[in-house]
């Protein structure tokens, strides 16, 4: 009994959610040698937008220019996050491989499940499900461009 109470005090006995049940916000930044992209989603209501910005350098400053946007329901984002296993990404830090001179760097931040923060980053080293996640975001945005 005392042992169980001590585990609870340190968070060890707490149930952790295995799935995303709500998606409040998500930012994914991809950087390459000459610029990058920023994907944003904010799920404040049932119908929200997924946006992709291009990072540009103008007048001595970095600037985000909206490149594409599409309506995206919160449930669609939740399903994608679960399919790609983003809860497992939390704490991932992918070190840049030796003998690779350049590549893609990423930074992922999300708030899900009523306040749970997820953070991951890496350089040419990505968590499982990352490539599928980015392809799905690009696919959703491409569909809106074709309409």
Task: Set out the residue ranges of the language-model regions.
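Sec-dependent bacterial lipoprotein signal peptides
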Residues: 1-10
């Amino acid at each position: 009994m005392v042992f169980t109470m001590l585990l609870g005090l340190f968070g060890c006995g707490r149930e952790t959610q295995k799935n995303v049940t709500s998606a409040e916000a998500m930012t994914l930044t991809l950087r390459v040698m000459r610029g990058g992209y920023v994907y944003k989603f904010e799920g404040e209501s049932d119908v929200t937008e997924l946006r992709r910005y291009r990072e540009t350098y103008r007048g001595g400053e970095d600037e985000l220019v909206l490149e594409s946007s599409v309506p995206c329901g919160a449930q669609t984002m939740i399903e994608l996050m679960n399919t790609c296993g983003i809860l497992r990404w939390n704490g991932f830090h992918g070190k840049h491989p030796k003998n690779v001179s350049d590549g893609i760097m990423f930074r992922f931040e999300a708030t899900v499940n009523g306040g749970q923060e997820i953070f991951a980053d890496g350089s040419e080293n990505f968590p499982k499900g990352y490539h599928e996640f980015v392809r799905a975001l690009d696919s959703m945005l491409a569909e809106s461009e074709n309409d």
